[in-house]
Amino acid sequence: MEPKFHAFMFPWFAFGHMIPFLHLANKLAEKGHRVTFLLPKKAQKQLEHHNLFPDSIVFHPLTVPPVNGLPAGAETTSDIPISLDNLLSKALDLTRDQVEAAVRALRPDLIFFDFAQWIPDMAKEHMIKSVSYIIVSATTIAHTHVPGGKLGVRPPGYPSSKVMFRENDVHALATLSIFYKRLYHQITTGLKSCDVIALRTCKEVEGMFCDFISRQYHKKVLLTGPMFPEPDTSKPLEERWNHFLSGFAPKSVVFCSPGSQVILEKDQFQELCLGMELTGLPFLLAVKPPRGSSTVQEGLPEGFEERVKDRGVVWGGWVQQPLILAHPSIGCFVNHCGPGTIWESLVSDCQMVLIPFLSDQVLFTRLMTEEFEVSVEVPREKTGWFSKESLSNAIKSVMDKDSDIGKLVRSNHTKLKEILVSPGLLTGYVDHFVEGLQENLI
């Protein structure tokens, strides 16, 4: 019987990072290992329901130190605009003393981290191992975060001529550039210094990029598999959404969710709404209020609600995304190609239309649309603007069962989904991942 280990987990202060770390923690706990999960105090309540093994996974709350310019009480990226992520990153670095005190007191065998590049050096001082666990796509790391890499420039030996940035991606690169220098240093330093690199992906989707990363860093790369969240069967789909969706034919409704960190300018928000209207299809749009508006209703185009009242809803709050995707009426999922959302998309039966906003989302979108041809990307102008016509046309192209594009992406998506949900694939990844940890670290 293999020895059991005690792991620390210290993810970036974003729910899009903390939740995938917790999914991995659940898999480790399921195999009898212990996990101490370090996170901001306020985040604990929102994550507790994701902890399936509370006897084996213990939350260790941290006090987020004040940083000049960071709003008081801000602890996660959900509390701030993307432009302030750099300051939250500084706050994360200032928790080092708290993290080291926990290490001294609890003596873990290894530490999983992503942005805290100082973890490997600290771990070595205490004779424990470090794992750089990357939850963004391997394509992003391979393209942008290899030694000597530059934002937007394909590195020598990069294994794809399709999964890359183009002229019209300036908007995504500009958004990241505010945060990029610090982020690049954090991730590459962590990858260089850690004992093992772990990626949340599978070779069936990103194998050539994982191999490239391993060669670039001269390190063992372990894959966890996609780490789909456990379905929450304790709560059914909210009645308001079940009632609304059940009023339409199977596979006829478009569900659009641009991501929790995306706050659109009012004109782009309205164009998004008008694009959904222009499809002529029933839709549910879950989106944050536009910049300058306190509610989504304030930002809607004039006369919009009246025109779509029988077939469309714009909602500014949280929704049960996995349960909505599983509803038989949903036929198309329009999303930002975030690292968690895209895996949910791939194992659903919905057609996929992608509107990436950040650089990592752009690269994974290209992987989906051009390497695998399982989705369609909404065209943009250089400014990042997408028109109602471009959105509507993309949606209609995949929803039309008789169109060449619709047939192609539907067929390819079905094939890829069959691979990802094949019996034993995901459990096999977890088994091999744990074996790899024990062979290389414990």
Curated annotation (Swiss-Prot):
UDP-alpha-D-glucose binds at residues 260, 319-321, 336-344, 358-361. Keywords: Glycosyltransferase, Transferase. GO terms for molecular function: UDP-glucosyltransferase activity. CDD domains: GT1_Gtf-like. It comes from the Eukaryota. The keyword Transmembrane does not apply. Its EC number is 2.4.1.-. PANTHER family: GLYCOSYLTRANSFERASE, UDP-GLYCOSYLTRANSFERASE 79B7-RELATED. Belongs to the UDP-glycosyltransferase family. This is UDP-glycosyltransferase 79B7. It comes from Arabidopsis thaliana (Mouse-ear cress). The gene is UGT79B7.
